[in-house]
């Protein structure tokens, strides 16, 4: 069963933290690395936001995606949500690599490729803002379906 409160809380925390990154939206990750405190703050916020996204994905897959094989890699969780029609496949392919970025942050920042280093912080903010909208739309639709089913069950 979906835990709407848990998912919405994680999305709200991420939104709050992403808003704090807006002063850096025109910087690339490479530029943020030029200042230790900026780099540390940006990395930590992005790591937390991406981790919450992966947690949300796994929760949704566990609740409604029982017909899918369990994702072995974090990036697969984003692709599975496209299979469950939460968002378009193109969006899944765009956001899925962020799981690898999160792993690079956690394990070894030096392994980031040039394209990732040149990613604008604003692009990541937009991607996860869009992600939150897709998830919230899904939750609204799913809750409506749950309420309809409950009403039908009561009327027999």
Features from the language model and the residues they span:
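Solvent-exposed interaction patches of small proteins and small membrane subunits
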Residues: 1-156
